[in-house]
Amino acid sequence: MLHVKTIEGQFDAKGLKFAIIATRFNDFIVDRLVGGAVDYLARHGCEREDMTIVRIPGAFEMPIVAQKLAKSGRYHGIIALGAVIRGATPHFDFVAGEATKGLAHISLDSGVPVGFGLLTTDSIEQAIERAGTKAGNKGVEAAAAVLETVRVMEQL
């Protein structure tokens, strides 16, 4: 069997600093995502004083705030948490699409990993399921993805 070098991220958050962007819109969902992300990072060695939660109005504001945080040089990773729930107008498509594209651009342009924890659901029930019930907690998943990516990038 051939031996191939494999680079993997360790799930050790000790010594790392994270910014968590959390929207106020749909905060009854987002607060569960934030709780999951904070708990995950703490369980993996991140000190609570090394986490900063930044509350913003909604998902559309995520990219500009993520950009400012990334440019600050103070954070190893950024976790973007929010919930956009489809309504009767096309507003959902514009907000969800632009927030998603913006966050991806920030990560690529800055080199700072941005965890995508923006729920885009068709109903409140689906959002609740993804905020800690049947479908897990997407805040935890976004935090885990950022932590692993930070540790992988340290090795590249």
Swiss-Prot record:
Positions annotated to bind (2S)-2-hydroxy-3-oxobutyl phosphate: A88, T89, R130
Pathway: Cofactor biosynthesis; riboflavin biosynthesis; riboflavin from 2-hydroxy-3-oxobutyl phosphate and 5-amino-6-(D-ribitylamino)uracil: step 1/2
Top enzyme class: transferase
Record keyword Transferase present: yes
Pfam families: DMRL_synthase
Residues that hold 5-amino-6-(D-ribitylamino)uracil according to the record: F25, A59, F60, E61, A83, V84, I85, F116
Entry keywords, A to Z: Riboflavin biosynthesis, Transferase
Active site: H91 (proton donor)
One GO CC annotation: riboflavin synthase complex
One MF annotation (Gene Ontology) recorded for this entry: 6,7-dimethyl-8-ribityllumazine synthase activity
GO biological process, alphabetically ordered: riboflavin biosynthetic process
Catalytic reaction equation(s): (2S)-2-hydroxy-3-oxobutyl phosphate + 5-amino-6-(D-ribitylamino)uracil = 6,7-dimethyl-8-(1-D-ribityl)lumazine + phosphate + 2 H2O + H(+)
Disulphide bridges, residue numbers: none
InterPro entries associated with the record: LS, LS/RS, LS/RS_sf
EC number(s) stated in the UniProt entry for this protein: 2.5.1.78
UniProt function note: Catalyzes the formation of 6,7-dimethyl-8-ribityllumazine by condensation of 5-amino-6-(D-ribitylamino)uracil with 3,4-dihydroxy-2-butanone 4-phosphate. This is the penultimate step in the biosynthesis of riboflavin.
Family that this chain belongs to: Belongs to the DMRL synthase family.
Family matches, as HAMAP family: Lumazine_synth
Protein name: 6,7-dimethyl-8-ribityllumazine synthase
Gene label: ribH
